[in-house]
Amino acid sequence: MKLNSANINVMVKACRKASKVLIRDFGEIEKLQVSLKGPGDFVTASDKRVEKILIEELQKARPDYSILSEEIGEINNDKSFRWIIDPIDGTANFLHGIPHFAISIGLEKEKEIICGIIYDPIKDEMFVAEKGNGSYLNNQRMRVSSRKKLKDCIIFTGGPRNNSKNRELSLKEYVNFSSKVLLPVRKLGSAALDMAYV
């Protein structure tokens, strides 16, 4: 079984290149806390820099594929293949100097996700999953836990966002769910990494 397909290799290369900018920018966050412009503007600029590198690398390797990205939206409109990009998943963590964020890229073929990667540049953890080929962390095969009972599990959740229109309702549902399951519930601030750790 081939560990990484050509498309996975393209995504890995793009992530590694973009992560250099992301790590540099993350190191500058502390200095920006006292600047006049503000750290929020810096994060937006960092998001755009990382996104630009990802798009350039992906388009260079696969010019016919379309791209859906968080910052700029849709590029091209190829119905067959589409890259889906989140340049910084866990932006609030990034902004506050918390080293728990990731770059994520998925590849959709005819509206079905066929592969994806989640890269934590701080820990140098590369999660790779491909339909029919399994999932890997730094080239080591990942296995599903043998736990069968919900009471033995830990739940990761995204919870309501601060800017959600239905935030109050979402928060009530979140608290209601958390109190019913009586299990350890985690919300670490990067949905992509949280899913990878499940």
Where are these regions (language model features)?
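Residue-level signal for inorganic ion chemistry
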Residues: 22, 47, 58, 91, ...
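Short, solvent-exposed loop/turn motifs
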Residues: 113, 141-143
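DPxDG-like acidic metal-binding loop motif
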Residues: 77-136
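Short glycine/threonine-rich catalytic loop with a Thr-x-Gly-x-Asp
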Residues: 47, 94-95, 188, 192
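Active-site/binding-pocket entry motifs
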Residues: 28, 73, 135, 161-162
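N-terminal subdomain of lithium-sensitive/metallo-dependent phosphomonoesterases centered on the IMPase/IPPase/PAP
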Residues: 1-88
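An extended, acidic
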Residues: 143-198
